């Protein structure tokens, strides 16, 4: 695992995560926690937030505990655990009921802002999607490849300026590989890859995404990214037709792997999906190969983003996971809704259905065989309009639990593990003094019923309190074009010249 080795690199990462310019590192770093030797005790001030009542899960321990009070100042958690006689009068007080549950804000490490409403290519949408992520308690996102880096940059700037509410966006820059519009594999020599990494690192990218990349290109990407104090993740293959098996990428030094584990059980004679859909985990040889690959992840401290529901989304949409608890299609404009409904019902991808249930078993093996602290949450839900990426984290959490992962481990994957995978756990991922005040407060106990994360009472990002119902209401009927005259902007093949 590549750790950020400089304070500047960390500050740039957190700064760019909210759209700040590269020179704004001072704005990105919160005040340190008070020194225990000199701190006289908490005194609430005007502008502070005090959270009282409910139960607290800090993202670290195995259980929740009664919340004895949290003091937030200037976007940072100043203290966890307050004196019962503390004067809170100058502060904004959130007095919670007993059923309220406080936890760190969620991370989505495969958080696509891309939509494809017409079936004519993806575009990145940064006006409604950010609001939907935040309203669902997702306070940090990694897009895992930007279809349109220019539009993504504008979106981050809108969030940073306060024009729209949204999560932290840890920019990935464009895809490195054939997933990028206009990528020319033969022209992208290792030297070309290195120069591109230098360019995007200068723009503040500290995490890169590979998809559809050749071995020599991936090695160049990893080497140069690490020299820039950046990390790399990848959607890889089996080694078939010039792809890279995750096994080999781990040996190259990659930091994270998306989707599937790879290894000897995915031979390079066929595509990864062709092997994965019929993977027989009851066969001792196959099971031993998977276990060997898991041990490689653990040995090299490589993070794994399983994205279970990405395959369920294209597959049979398991009803227990893909049921509605909100009117998601209500966020479409009337015209866009007509377009989306004209394509329904979507065909079921039978291959992805089989892969979904295989992956349920392999992710449980990963957890049980030593990978619990390396498991992260990512959704990979580029949307066709029926389901939105912002809601996906809750579906992914439920799918992980249905796979046999304990709720507390699934929640860690969505909080502290994800923060560590990005190298930002110094300031994010848990409820501790000195960290950014990114919190999700829900009604119910997700440690006993993981679906409780869906019922957000409050979302706090950088110390600002949001009411989810108000956020949802603010973007109803606003996703997509309002008429045929606006349709071309929403067609990636037309506007961006890709597929």
Predicted segments with their positions:
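Active-site neighborhoods of metal-dependent hydrolases
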Residues: 199-206, 213, 262-398, 402-403, ...
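Histidine-centered divalent metal-coordination motifs
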Residues: 107-114, 235, 259, 307
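Bacterial N-terminal signal peptides
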Residues: 9-21
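Acidic, glycine-enriched loop/beta-strand segments at the rims
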Residues: 37-41, 56-69, 81-84, 388, ...
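Active-site mouth loops of central-metabolism enzymes
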Residues: 113-124, 178-192, 239-240
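Divalent metal-dependent hydrolysis catalytic cores, especially in the metallo-beta-lactamase
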Residues: 129-150, 166-176, 199-213, 222, ...
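Histidine-rich, glycine-flanked metal-binding segment
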Residues: 31-47, 56, 60-103
């Amino acid at each position: 695992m590549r750790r950020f080795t400089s304070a500047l690199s960390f500050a740039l990462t957190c700064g760019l995560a909210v759209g700040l310019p590269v020179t704004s590192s001072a704005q990105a770093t919160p005040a340190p926690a008070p020194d225990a030797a000199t701190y006289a005790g908490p005194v609430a001030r005007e502008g502070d937030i005090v959270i009282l009542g409910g139960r607290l899960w800090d993202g670290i321990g195995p259980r929740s505990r009664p919340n004895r009070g949290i003091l937030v100042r200037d976007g940072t958690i100043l203290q966890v655990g307050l004196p019962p006689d503390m004067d809170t009068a100058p502060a904004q007080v959130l007095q919670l009921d007993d059923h309220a549950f406080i936890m760190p804000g969620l991370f989505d490490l495969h958080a696509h802002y891309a939509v494809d409403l017409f079936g004519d290519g993806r575009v990145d949408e940064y006006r409604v999607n950010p609001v939907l992520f935040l309203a669902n308690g997702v306070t940090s996102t990694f897009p895992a490849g930007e279809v349109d880096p220019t539009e993504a940059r504008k979106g981050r700037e809108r969030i940073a300026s306060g024009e729209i509410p949204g999560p932290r966006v840890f920019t990935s820059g464009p895809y490195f590989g054939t997933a990028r519009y206009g990528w020319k594999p033969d022209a992208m020599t290792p030297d070309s890859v290195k120069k591109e990494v230098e360019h995007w690192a200068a723009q503040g990218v500290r995490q890169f995404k590979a998809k559809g990349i050749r071995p020599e290109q991936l090695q160049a990407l990893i080497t140069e990214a690490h020299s820039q104090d950046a990390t790399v993740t990848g959607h890889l293959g089996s080694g078939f037709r010039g792809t890279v098996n995750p096994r080999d990428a781990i040996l190259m030094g990659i930091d994270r792997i998306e989707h599937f584990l790879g290894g000897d059980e995915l031979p390079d004679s066929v595509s990864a999906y062709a092997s994965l859909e019929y993977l027989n985990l009851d066969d001792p040889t196959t099971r031993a190969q998977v276990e060997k690959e898991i041990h490689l992840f653990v040995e090299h401290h490589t993070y794994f983003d399983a994205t279970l529901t990405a395959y369920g989304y294209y597959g049979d949409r398991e009803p227990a996971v893909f049921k509605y608890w909100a009117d998601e299609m209500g966020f479409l404009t009337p015209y866009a809704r007509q377009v989306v409904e004209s394509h329904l019902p979507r065909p079921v991808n039978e291959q992805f259905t089989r892969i979904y249930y295989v992956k349920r078993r392999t992710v449980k093996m990963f957890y049980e065989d030593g990978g619990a602290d390396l498991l992260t949450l990512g959704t990979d839900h580029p949307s066709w309009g029926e389901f939105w990426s912002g809601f996906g984290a809750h579906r992914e959490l439920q799918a992980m639990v249905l796979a046999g992962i304990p709720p507390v481990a699934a929640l860690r994957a969505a909080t502290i593990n994800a923060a560590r995978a990005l190298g930002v756990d110094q300031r994010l991922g848990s409820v501790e003094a000195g960290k950014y005040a990114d919190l999700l407060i829900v009604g119910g106990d997700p440690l006993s019923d993981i679906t409780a994360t869906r019922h957000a009472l409050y979302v706090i990002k950088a110390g600002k309190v949001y009411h989810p119902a108000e956020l949802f209401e603010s973007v109803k009927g606003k996703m997509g074009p309002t008429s045929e005259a606006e349709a071309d902007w929403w067609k990636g093949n037309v506007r961006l010249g890709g597929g």
